[in-house]
Design a protein with these regions (language model features):
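Active-site ExK catalytic segment of metal-dependent nucleases
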Residues: 87-94, 140, 230-233, 244-246
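Conserved kinase catalytic-core helix
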Residues: 158-192, 196-197, 205-206
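Membrane-embedded alpha-helical bundles of multi-pass transporters/translocases
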Residues: 60, 103-106, 111, 123, ...
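Catalytic activation segment of kinase domains across protein kinase-like and atypical kinase folds
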Residues: 195-262
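Helical subdomain adjoining the active site within ATP-dependent kinase catalytic cores
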Residues: 2-29, 253-354
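ATP-binding glycine-rich phosphate-binding loop
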Residues: 25-82
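ATP-binding glycine-rich loop module of kinase domains
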Residues: 65-66, 72-115
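Conserved structural core of kinase catalytic domains
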Residues: 119-166
Length: 354
């Protein structure tokens, strides 16, 4: 099996249509990633009329179809490219490039695929410059899915503090913690907007004793549904040696917001869950105790208590806190969350040496 740097470089160069890089297993993969993508020339498409775009030089014919979904910043359309169907993501505002976001999502997909989790992030297939839309990108269509918020609404036993509710939440957190641990460790990446609506659940594809091997450890997952991480519109990568930011999908907060930042992503999804009174009221004392432990930052502030008292529906206070240059999620690092769940919920997650 290729080492992770060779695997990552090969698949990225295939996308870029550049000669493969012959490299050893280096530790500073984010810098390699950044250097490979900075010189990429995005193909410019010509509008042929009626939503049809083409570029002879890039051998692309793209037909924009119906709108699939609309978020705060982006719009998803269905599209057909050379006879295959994808999502096409564009910014809601004209002349806003999604080039950085596209590459960050592509990089996340490649590295998680190396660890036997190709479903974890939808693959990016084309990055193109479309008239009136600027740089957009196509990606895999995720079928038979629901956001995790909707998944909880349909499967939680509300207002009943039971182990079944705990397990549903812990299954998701284990998957996300593994994704984030890999992205931070290998790509120096933070998602920076990890919340309930940016996680899709595919119930038709459960995980049964699914094994992921990372640096001499074998992680085994069991879950009633697979988690898919989406929307890299605020993601960033940083140099693992200097800790300096290299690339951001958004300029928001990047001047002081170092990347990666320990515990940041998992802290946000935990706060997003705990901020919902119905969720707090449907977890057992054991699960609540873990949330209270995880939601303490490096200043000693207990955000579980703060969120239970203060109404913050958009989590503005939490975003402000985690984007501060000195923030650390001391108890919400992926490794600590995985260890706590392994010790508290037998069968959801296990860890072995190999």
């Amino acid at each position: 099996m290729k080492n992770r740097a060779q695997y990552f470089s090969q698949h990225l160069c295939e996308f870029l249509k550049t000669p493969p890089q012959h490299i050893s297993d280096i530790t500073n993969l984010p810098l390699l990633f950044y250097n490979l993508i900075t010189s990429y020339n995005v193909p410019k498409l010509i509008h042929e009329g009626n939503g049809l775009y083409s570029a002879a030089s890039a051998d692309i014919t793209l037909k924009k179809l119906d709108e699939a979904n609309r978020g705060s910043y982006g719009v998803l359309y269905y599209c057909n490219v050379n006879g295959k169907y994808y999502y096409l993501k564009a910014n809601k505002e004209p002349n806003v490039s999604l080039k950085n976001e596209a590459f960050l999502q592509l990089g996340a997909h490649i590295i998680l695929s190396y660890y036997n989790m190709p479903w974890a992030v939808p693959s990016v297939h084309h990055i193109v410059d479309i008239p009136d839309y600027d740089v957009c990108f196509t990606m895999d269509i995720v079928t038979d899915m629901k956001t995790f918020g909707r998944h909880m609404m349909e499967h939680m036993k509300w207002n009943t503090k039971c182990i079944e509710n705990d397990v549903l939440v812990m299954e998701l957190l284990c998957q996300l913690a593994l994704y984030i641990m890999i992205l931070e460790k290998d790509l120096g990446m933070n998602h920076r907007d990890l919340k309930l609506n940016n996680v899709l659940m595919v119930k038709q594809e459960p995980l049964v004793n699914h094994t992921i091997e990372i640096d001499g450890l074998s992680y085994q997952l069991n879950s009633s549904a697979r988690a898919v991480l989406i929307d890299f519109g605020f993601a960033c990568i940083g140099d693992l040696e200097t800790r300096g930011s290299l690339l951001s999908a958004s300029e928001y907060g990047i001047v002081v917001d170092m990347c990666p930042k320990a515990g940041r992503d998992m802290f946000l999804i935990l706060a997003n869950m705990w901020n919902v009174p119905a969720v707090r009221g449907s977890l057992t004392a054991k699960a609540a105790g873990l949330f209270k432990k995880w939601l303490v930052d490096n200043t000693g502030k207990n955000w579980s208590s703060w969120l239970a008292v203060n109404r913050d529906p958009e989590l503005k206070s939490v975003y402000n806190a985690i984007n501060h240059e000195n923030f650390l999620g001391v108890n919400s690092t992926p490794a600590k969350i995985l260890e706590d769940i392994r010790g508290s919920y037998e069968g959801v997650f296990s860890l072995h040496l190999f």
